[in-house]
Design a protein with these regions (language model features):
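Extracellular S/T/G-rich loop segment that most often corresponds to the catalytic His/Ser-adjacent loop
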Residues: 160-179, 306-448, 452-457, 469-470, ...
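Hydrophobic, small-residue-rich alpha-helical packing segments that form membrane-like cores
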Residues: 239-254, 265, 280, 289, ...
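C-terminal subdomain of the subtilisin-like protease fold in secreted/lumenal serine endopeptidases
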Residues: 10, 256, 260-269, 276, ...
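Autoinhibitory N-terminal propeptides
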Residues: 1-74, 83-123, 132, 145, ...
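Short acidic, glycine-rich surface-loop motifs adjacent to enzyme active sites
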Residues: 100, 229, 247-275, 298-299, ...
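Subtilisin-like serine protease catalytic core
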Residues: 121-241, 258-259, 276, 290-292, ...
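Edge beta-strands of jelly-roll/beta-sandwich modules across compartments, strongly enriched
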Residues: 475-486
């Protein structure tokens, strides 16, 4: 066990989020082995792409070597030479800086025994006509009959392909549709949906039902505004920066066209405090207030992925006298700890049960034990994991030590009071650790662990890793751990005793979006994969009436029949496909209110209120709101 680096980091600007500070203080060759640290860095150009919140003018930055791309509401994306990242910290107009994160679509694979067609809920007098449905996703098969009018012309008003960096309007798309073959059409409009995800989402929200009414989407006569997320780079996952560009494009286009817009976002990630404080979440809240806009976001598929643990350590009170809090997790045992030294390390401790036959340089035992005041969190890392990161979030007012033990029995003791970067090696695993501090928008503290294969190794050590949390002075005692999305880690990598609550993906945690979970329409039951809401009931009860009730409601998300990328139909599952039910329903409400003149103010939070009021109870759910299905149940009752 070696403490390789305990110095203060060179890039510890309090204007930067924690993971950005860690990335800037880590050499490029080391970042390249990390799942997250190099996201946003251009290795060829040696530049960083970052998100900033700012005030005033950024003209001085734009006049130099920094490329400035202004968005909306005081947000911008900057492309900054690595050597000039310190300039941001010195620029008074820059308030806060974050690096991009990867986004993952909320779909699941596998067979489905029974299927559900969106068109089974047809509303004769409401079709979405006069309303824009914006699909920000993997693209769309624009030639599909489901996205055409009765005369064969396209219902797509605009298509912006970020991968091609080209915008196509309805005139260009109609020209392509008039071509003699699909190959010729794709020469005129070369935008394709390689995965079919965006095509399925668009079909559920607003497909025309070319194969029959049962296959129609919810807002079957709406006009479509489509953004294909991505860049020409090799790696396939879109980033939060591309989402922010897309949303800026959509709300500005809706204002330009003077049309209400319902926006569908069927993706997210697990990095963050999950409380609406990240720049992305705040950006969505601001975008939702521009024009006549409704933003619907899927709650993600992390409910059963084993990627989250939350609970409370023993509460000591301000005096530091330890006492077991109600509901506190504990090891339930008392184990002797041995003092281990070597390579300059002192005052670090190892449970007796994990000591036998393990370490050398044991110089004796001390009077110390793993007691019921200690909280044990166990993480299984599967074989062949090339890297994994773990976030530990806690209240900054709470102080406790963290002991991380590897499967071999090696361990490190983390000084959570000393901010900045620390580097360790346990077995064949290198650990980059960053102790964060509160930020201008965040009162919590993050302790970030990035586990990488050590030099000469291809994988991190597999087996059970253990976190021991020992309270020093705790007021609330609340803690929460997050792993990366289940999409990018081994199915065997998960917490031993996971907590399914608070598994919403970001940005569905934004306050002013409509957060959509999934239920199984055949069995009329909550879908266990669906991201759940808040762990502590007081988080609902003690804050403003309903802004922290998440998800807002659920919609069908299992075995949904939707258009595929090749022109046929097939079943899809996930909150990705529950979300467009609500997006389509929002479009219908705005048609009734705004287009038909019944309520010109029916957009934004008012649409959310109407949808909540119209939601129906779900079988087996007796108390509302709850963490599984949100405020009032499901939007589509069979």
């Amino acid at each position: 066990i070696w403490n390789i680096n305990r110095k203060e980091t060179a890039m510890d600007s309090q204007k930067n989020e924690n993971i950005l500070n860690l990335a800037l203080d880590t050499p490029e060759e080391e970042r390249e082995r990390s799942m997250e640290l190099n996201v946003g860095y251009d290795t060829a150009e040696k530049t960083w792409e970052v998100i900033v919140k700012y005030h005033g003018s950024l003209e001085r930055l734009a006049a130099g070597n920094i490329m400035v791309e202004e968005l909306i509401a005081g947000y911008a994306i900057l492309t900054v030479p690595e050597s000039e990242m310190t300039v941001l910290a010195e620029t008074e107009q820059i308030e806060y800086v974050e690096k991009p994160k990867r986004l993952f679509f909320s779909d699941l694979t596998g067979s489905t025994a029974a299927c559900y067609a969106p068109g089974s809920r047809i509303y004769e007098n409401l079709t979405g006509k006069g309303v824009l449905v914006a699909v920000i996703d993997s693209g769309i098969s624009y030639w599909n009959e489901d996205f055409r009018n009765a005369d064969g012309t396209t219902r797509i008003r605009y298509l912006w392909d970020q991968v091609l960096d080209r915008e196509f309007d309805s005139v260009q798309i109609n020209e392509a549709l008039s071509a003699d073959s699909r190959q010729q059409a794709e020469m005129l409009v070369p935008s394709i949906d390689t995965t079919g995800h965006g095509t399925a989402v668009a079909g559920i929200a607003g497909g025309g039902g070319a194969a029959g009414a049962a296959y129609a989407g919810i807002a079957r006569e709406s006009e479509l505004l489509v953004v294909r997320l991505g860049t020409p780079r090799a790696e396939s996952f879109p980033r939060t920066t591309e989402l922010m560009r897309a949303l800026t494009y959509v709300v500005n286009k809706a204002v330009e066209l003077q049309m209400p817009v319902a926006v569908n976002l069927s993706f997210g990630n697990t990095y963050g405090a999950h409380n609406g404080t990240s720049l992305l979440e705040r950006f969505l809240d601001n975008a939702a207030e521009i024009g006549r806009t409704v933003i619907c976001v899927g709650s993600g598929n992390e409910g059963a992925s084993g990627g989250h643990v939350g609970g409370s350590v023993a509460v000591t009170g301000r005096g530091g006298q330890r006492g077991v809090a109600a509901g506190a997790r504990s090891s339930g045992t008392s184990e002797t700890m041995r003092n281990v030294t070597g390579s300059g390390m002192t005052d670090e401790f190892l449970p007796e049960s994990q000591y036998a036959g393990g370490l050398t340089n044991v110089v004796g035992t001390v009077d110390r034990a793993v007691t019921q005041n200690m909280t044990r969190v166990e993480l299984v890392i599967g074989n062949y994991e090339t890297g994994i990161n773990i976030q530990l979030w806690k209240e900054y007012t709470d102080r406790y030590t963290v002991i991380l033990t590897a499967p071999s029995g090696d361990f490190v003791l983390v000084d959570t009071d000393r901010p900045g970067k620390q580097t360790y090696r346990l077995g064949q695993t290198e650990i980059l650790l960053y102790n964060g501090e509160p930020a201008p928008y965040l009162t919590s503290q993050e302790i970030y662990f990035d586990l990488l294969p050590a030099a000469g190794s291809r994988y991190v050590d597999s087996g059970i890793w253990t976190f021991l949390l020992e309270p020093v002075r705790t007021i609330t005692g609340n803690y929460t751990f997050y792993l990366p999305s289940g999409t990018v880690r081994s199915a065997r990598t998960r917490f031993v005793r996971p907590t399914p609550d608070v598994t919403l993906t970001i940005p569905s945690t934004a306050s002013k979006v409509i957060t959509v979970g999934a239920y199984d329409p055949v069995y009329e039951a909550y879908a266990d994969f669906s991201g759940r809401g808040y762990l502590y009931q007081e988080q609902v009860n003690s804050r403003t009436s309903d802004s922290f009730v998440k998800p807002d409601l659920v919609a069908p998300g299992v075995g949904i029949i939707a258009p595929d990328r090749d022109g046929g139909y097939g079943p899809v599952t996930g909150t990705s496909f529950a979300t467009p039910f609500v997006t389509g329903a929002a479009a219908l409400l705005m048609q009734w209110g705004i287009v038909m003149g019944n309520d010109p103010y029916l957009y934004g939070e008012k649409v959310k209120a109407y949808l909540r009021r119209g939601a129906k109870p779900i079988r087996g759910e007796t108390e509302y709101p709850n963490a599984r299905v949100g405020a009032y149940g499901n939007i589509v009752s069979s």
